[in-house]
C-alpha cells in the first residue's frame, strides 16, 4: 500500500511537471511571436546612426527624408516635415521608414540600361585573333 501511494504521488508530480513545462513552453512561444511581430523600435543617438549606416550601406543617409511616399492626407504631410529623430527616437520606426532616409544611389549606380564593358572578354577576343593569325603564318 505504501509503495502504491509513493508511486501515485510520483506519477502525479510527473504529470504536473509536464503540464507546467507545456504551459511554460506555450507562453515562451507566444512571447517570441509577440516580440517578433513588433513593427517599430525606438532608436536614439549613436544607436540610430549605426542602424542607418547599416540599412543605407554605401549610399549614406539624411536626417530629413529626401523622398516621401505619395501624400494622402494630413498624416502623410506631417510626416514629411519631421526628421528621423522625431520619428525613430520619440515614437519608434520600422525598417521601411529608415530606408526613406537613405540617400539615393548616384546615376551611374542606378543606370542599368547601358551595357557595361568587360575588358576581360576583349582581351580574350584579341588573344583568339592573334592565335588564329599565328596559325595561318606557320602553314
From Swiss-Prot:
GO BP term, pick one: regulation of muscle cell differentiation
PROSITE patterns: INSULIN
Stated role: The insulin-like growth factors, isolated from plasma, are structurally and functionally related to insulin but have a much higher growth-promoting activity.
UniProt record similarity statement: Belongs to the insulin family.
Record region (B): 39-67
Region annotation (D) ranges: 104-113
Naturally occurring in which organism (per UniProt): Myxine glutinosa
Protein name: Insulin-like growth factor
Region of interest called Disordered, as start-end residue ranges on this chain: 108-139
Biased composition (Basic residues): 115-139
Locations listed in the record: Secreted
Keyword Aminoacyl-tRNA synthetase assigned: no
Domain of life the protein comes from: Eukaryota
Annotated Gene Ontology cellular component terms: extracellular space
Region (A): 83-103
A GO molecular-function descriptor: insulin-like growth factor receptor binding
Region (E): 114-139
Cited Pfam families: Insulin
Amino acid at each position: 500500500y505504501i509503495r502504491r501511494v509513493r508511486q501515485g504521488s510520483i506519477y502525479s508530480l510527473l504529470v504536473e511537471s509536464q503540464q507546467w513545462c507545456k504551459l511554460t513552453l506555450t507562453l515562451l512561444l507566444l512571447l517570441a511571436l509577440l516580440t517578433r511581430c513588433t513593427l517599430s523600435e525606438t532608436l536614439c543617438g549613436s544607436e540610430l546612426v549605426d542602424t542607418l549606416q547599416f540599412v543605407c550601406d554605401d549610399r549614406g543617409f539624411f536626417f530629413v527624408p529626401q523622398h516621401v511616399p505619395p501624400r494622402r492626407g494630413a498624416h502623410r504631410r506631417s510626416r514629411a516635415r519631421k526628421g528621423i529623430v522625431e520619428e525613430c527616437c520619440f515614437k519608434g520606426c520600422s525598417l521601411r521608414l529608415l530606408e526613406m532616409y537613405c540617400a539615393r544611389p548616384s546615376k551611374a549606380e542606378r543606370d542599368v540600361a547601358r551595357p557595361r564593358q568587360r575588358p576581360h572578354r576583349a582581351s580574350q577576343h584579341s588573344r583568339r585573333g592573334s592565335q588564329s593569325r599565328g596559325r595561318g603564318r606557320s602553314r
